Amino acid sequence: MGFFVQLTEAISRHQTLLVTGLDPNPEMLNTWAQGRGMGNRSFLSLARHWIKAVIEATADHVCAYKPSLGFYQALGPVGLELLREVRELVPPGIPLIVDAKHGDLNSSSALASYLFRDLGADAVTLSPLAGQDIAAPFLLYPQRAVVVTCHSSNPAAWRIQHHPNEQDPLFLRVVRECQSWGTPEQLLLEVGTSDPEILARVRREAPERFLILRSLWAEEDRLDA
């Protein structure tokens, strides 16, 4: 079953739009372990325990899982084995989106092969600044998808994303350009922002695309507008 079908069926089945991260962040996990009397365990053991607990608690309430590749790479070979365990723990019918924010053109084909053939991931996040060629190797795989990051919530990114002016900022140029790279079933957009107006501007430019939202929780009361 392809990514898009899995995603839409999980949304319908679980009546949710929640995408849950599976990020073994050392600072977060150490705090979590101390509060449960598990501080004497190895970090790898903690990560396994935490990931399994999160999946078991959320499997009926999410439409996708999204582990950040960098946290697993930082652990070395055991981290990549842990990512493979994540793939095995995620229930069938729930897509796995690997949050790689990949932007290196030379390694795209190799990463696409690893993620989609070896790991069995369903989608990957990409950084778009290298242009269409960054997405092409991933879109060669049928039934898989890419998620293009078009806006970051990081305050330091503002001067880049909103250049040269608010009437025609870079982030909207990215939204317009990348839609030509793949169909709505192949290419989604990720929007990180605490400003609902930015989300609204992206939606106006991309009315048919699925959007993955980040950093918008504090603005819940303003989303309907």
Where are these regions (language model features)?
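Catalytic beta/alpha-barrel core
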Residues: 66-67, 72-75, 94-97, 101, ...
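Short, well-ordered coil/turn segments that N-cap beta-strands
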Residues: 14-18, 60-63, 92-94, 122, ...
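A general structural detector for well-ordered alpha-helical segments in enzyme core domains, enriched
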Residues: 50, 54, 82-86, 111-115, ...
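Short, acidic/polar
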Residues: 43-57, 107-115, 171, 221-223
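A C-terminal functional module that forms or caps the active site or interfaces directly
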Residues: 189, 193-225
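Surface-exposed amphipathic alpha-helices with a cationic face
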Residues: 8-12, 84-91, 139-141, 179-182, ...
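Conserved anion-binding
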Residues: 25, 34-38, 104-188
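Conserved N-terminal beta1-alpha1 strand-loop-helix module at the mouth
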Residues: 1-67, 72-85, 89-93
